[in-house]
């Protein structure tokens, strides 16, 4: 990775009884750094050459304000969730209206699905870092419906909201 780009590799097992594993690669590029009045903005793509199980794309902005750190983004694919809004990119081209869903066994760039689909969704979070303690409180909104995980016996999320304490 570089100061403006990061990459992630994931290898996930869904159900060992049927040997259901999936790998995916994610790339995120920072478009610009946080400034006094502007948030840091990045664009990312998950599952670049995978089977599409994790595929999502996003644009995300982050801004620190005092002891708080705020994040807000728009996502497609898994990050669209149930779809908060119509995909705004359809206004640019009808190509963005239909999301490719046949990825075969993976291993090939699946650019036909990038930033596409009828819907997009919002995600975000906030964190508060205590000055006097190495502790932060976090709140997150994640619209992912975890369809694959639920289909193989995983728990269905009851809420898109999560809270955490980090120390």
Regions found by a protein language model. Give the residues of each.
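Detector for outer-membrane/organellar transmembrane beta-barrel domains
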Residues: 56-144
């Amino acid at each position: 990775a570089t100061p403006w780009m990061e990459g992630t590799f994931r290898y996930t097992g869904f159900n060992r009884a049927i040997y259901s594993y999936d790998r995916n690669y994610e790339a995120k590029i920072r478009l610009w750094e946080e400034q006094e009045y502007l948030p840091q903005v990045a664009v990312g793509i998950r599952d670049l050459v995978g089977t599409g199980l994790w595929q999502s794309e996003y644009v995300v902005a982050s801004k620190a304000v005092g002891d708080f750190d705020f994040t807000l983004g728009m996502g497609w694919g898994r990050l669209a969730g149930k779809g908060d809004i119509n995909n705004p990119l359809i206004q640019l081209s009808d190509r963005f209206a239909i999301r490719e869903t046949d990825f075969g066994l993976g291993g090939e760039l699946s650019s036909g699905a990038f930033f596409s689909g009828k819907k997009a969704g919002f995600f975000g979070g906030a964190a508060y870092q205590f000055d006097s303690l190495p502790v932060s409180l976090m709140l997150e909104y994640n619209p992912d419906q975890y369809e694959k995980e639920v289909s193989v016996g995983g728990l269905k999320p009851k809420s898109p909201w999560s809270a955490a304490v980090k120390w």
